[in-house]
């Protein structure tokens, strides 16, 4: 009888432990996903705002003018491919 009572008490303990483990994994997943989003947004802001501040704007404009047709052509070719 005592053994049956002990087994009945183990089951809720296992369920609580499993739920806590799952909740901990989910919480860590959410935290690390948010951290990754902050890093990505920070890199985007850095490269769009601060990266080319010390360069001559004419030089940057020439680079953009050279790369724009290449990028447009490659995007157009990518979407026109037949699979």
From Swiss-Prot:
Q: Which UniProt keywords apply?
A: Developmental protein
Q: In which tissues is it expressed?
A: Endoderm-specific pattern of expression during embryogenesis; anterior and posterior midgut primordia.
User: According to the lineage, what is the superkingdom?
Assistant: Eukaryota
User: What is the recorded function of this protein according to its Swiss-Prot or TrEMBL entry?
Assistant: Involved in morphogenesis and development.
This protein's name: Protein midgut expression 1
Q: Which organism is it from?
A: Drosophila melanogaster (Fruit fly)
Q: What is the lineage of its organism?
A: Eukaryota, Metazoa, Ecdysozoa, Arthropoda, Hexapoda
Gene of this entry: mex1
């Amino acid at each position: 009888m005592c053994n049956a009572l002990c087994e009945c008490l183990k089951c809720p303990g296992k369920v609580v432990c499993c739920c806590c483990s799952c909740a901990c994994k989910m919480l860590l997943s959410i935290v690390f996903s948010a951290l990754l989003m902050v890093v990505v947004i920070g890199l985007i802001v850095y490269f769009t705002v601060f990266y080319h501040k010390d360069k001559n704007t004419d030089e940057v404009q020439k680079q953009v003018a050279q790369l724009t047709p290449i990028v447009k052509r490659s995007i157009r070719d990518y979407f026109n491919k037949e699979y």
